[in-house]
């Protein structure tokens, strides 16, 4: 194991947010320099490269602090680089994020701003939150695979929308509209899948589903509050199940997905919580899963929580943004109306008095 390197290692995914991350990196670099943050940088060149970079940086180069520049997918790769090495305890490692683009669901849980200069100040301050990490075991052509996640995972419609969205990304189409278009297309074509869910060894669900989300944070899918009661340091995974529901009912409640109220407004929504979650599909291997925007392979899926296992840099207090005070209708009228005769006389009297006294 190498001697500890005190600098941050900035891992930049230049293709995040349809290339915005790479385009903005020179600006972000200068902001970090201006803030007095000492760092080295590495640019990813292909999918999952960040996993290799981070793992090697810990084991061979002694880095203990990482800044992820990109979106939730980049964060996920950095997390997997940290958790797929066994040389340095993950509790000794600190991670910060510099969110780029429109998704960035993890940062919403902690009110991390999108302004680069504000994020740099947060990183400089160094306030950390000891965060839980999810561990997912799934199957790829019969082989067991493991993937770690910071925020959330999903299957059913969730995974299908993720797949469609990623195809649109490759075509250079980005943003929230991209996600909503994918959502509508997938709702119209999705086929209900029968699953069974076990939580801490007890079967709690055996029915058809539209979608299932599993995670330790509240937001998923570009700002949707799919797990509104999730707490990222309670050692538990939250599960939200949307059963078979009519297209019209689901469409009528899409807006409620963004504030979390859908769990109380749609009878077909169930929520659970536990340390170990197992999802089995009928027939076997008929479902795929996604974690933070990356499509993975087949069921069954086993989820477990690694409690309080990494230090994440967050604001000590929410960043306050000054809002311009809105003028009242009376103030607007006064600002555009000519002065009245009485007002003009008063101003003249004041002026005369001033000149006389001087």
Language-model features: where?
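Short gly/pro-enriched beta-turn/loop segments at secondary-structure junctions
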Residues: 3-6, 129, 144-145, 188-192, ...
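ATP/nucleoside-binding phosphotransfer catalytic cores, i.e., glycine-rich phosphate-binding loops
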Residues: 199-201, 206, 226, 231-232, ...
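Short amphipathic alpha-helical segments
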Residues: 22-24, 79-82, 108-110, 225-226
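Catalytic core of DAGKc-family lipid kinases
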Residues: 35, 44, 84-210
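Short glycine/serine/threonine-rich phosphate/pyrophosphate-binding segments
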Residues: 50, 73-78, 105, 131
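Glycine-rich phosphate/pyrophosphate-binding beta-alpha loops
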Residues: 154, 158, 213-227, 295
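ATP/NTP phosphate-donor binding region
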Residues: 1-69, 80, 117, 319, ...
């Amino acid at each position: 194991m190498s001697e500890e390197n005190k600098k941050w290692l900035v891992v930049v995914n230049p293709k995040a947010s349809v290339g915005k991350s790479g385009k903005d990196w020179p600006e972000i670099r200068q902001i970090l320099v201006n803030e007095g943050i000492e760092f080295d940088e590495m640019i990813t060149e292909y999918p999952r490269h960040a996993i290799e970079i981070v793992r090697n940086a810990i084991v061979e180069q002694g880095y203990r602090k990482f800044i992820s520049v990109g979106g939730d997918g980049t964060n996920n790769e950095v997390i997997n680089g940290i958790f797929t090495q066994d040389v340095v305890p993950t509790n000794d490692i600190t991670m910060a994020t510099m969110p780029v683009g429109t998704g960035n669901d993890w940062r919403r849980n902690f009110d991390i701003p999108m302004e680069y200069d504000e994020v740099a100040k947060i990183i400089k301050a160094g306030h950390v939150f000891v965060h839980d990490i999810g561990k997912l075991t799934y199957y790829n052509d019969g082989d067991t695979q493991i993937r770690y996640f910071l925020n959330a995972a999903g299957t059913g419609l969730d995974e299908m929308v993720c797949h469609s969205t990623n195809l649109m990304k490759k075509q250079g189409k980005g943003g929230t509209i991209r996600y909503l278009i994918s959502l509508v297309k997938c709702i119209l074509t999705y086929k209900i899948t029968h699953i069974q869910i076990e939580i801490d060894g007890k079967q709690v669900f055996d029915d058809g589903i539209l979608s299932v989300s599993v995670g330790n944070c509240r937001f998923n899918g570009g700002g949707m509050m799919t797990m509104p009661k999730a707490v990222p340091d309670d050692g538990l995974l939250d599960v939200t199940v949307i059963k078979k529901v009519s297209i019209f009912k689901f469409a009528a409640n899409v807006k409620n997905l963004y504030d979390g109220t859908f769990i109380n407004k749609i009878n077909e929504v169930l929520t659970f919580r536990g340390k170990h979650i197992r999802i089995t599909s009928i027939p076997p291997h008929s479902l795929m899963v996604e974690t933070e925007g990356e499509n993975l392979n087949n069921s069954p899926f086993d989820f477990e929580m690694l409690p309080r296992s990494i230090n994440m840099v967050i604001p000590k207090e929410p960043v306050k943004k000054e809002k311009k005070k809105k003028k009242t209708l009376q103030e607007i009228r006064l600002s555009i109306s000519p002065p009245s005769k009485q007002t003009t006389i008063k101003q003249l009297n004041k002026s005369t008095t001033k000149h006389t006294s001087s």
